[in-house]
Amino acid sequence: MLFRSVALIETNLDDINAEILGHFVEKAFAAGALDVFHTPIQMKKNRPGVLLTVLCASTDADKFSELLLRETSAFGVRR
């Protein structure tokens, strides 16, 4: 059985529109992400937001963290 180490990278966003999300998903898959998805969340003061998640090889975690910061309005990522 083959086991592969993967990284989970996430960020919460409250000011992103669907077009930017779609663009990011396409770029991340083109760059080699294993999976990319966004989940609706409720943020503080009951504001709607999005949890953006990228699964990638552990060796690519820095690359996808930088992509998230460059292509979205995120101030940081959770790894």
Task: Go through each PLM region and give its residues.
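Short, hydrophobic beta-strand segments
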Residues: 7-11, 48-54
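Helix N-cap motif at beta-to-alpha junctions
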Residues: 17, 54-62
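Long hydrophobic segments that form regular secondary structure
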Residues: 11-38
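Short, ordered loop/turn segments at secondary-structure junctions
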Residues: 40-43
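Glycine-rich, acidic loop segments that terminate in or are immediately followed by a histidine
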Residues: 59-66, 76
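A common structural junction motif
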Residues: 30-35, 69-77
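Short, small-residue-biased leader/transition segments that mark boundaries at the very start
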Residues: 1-2
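Short amphipathic alpha-helices in soluble, non-transmembrane regions
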Residues: 24-25, 64-72
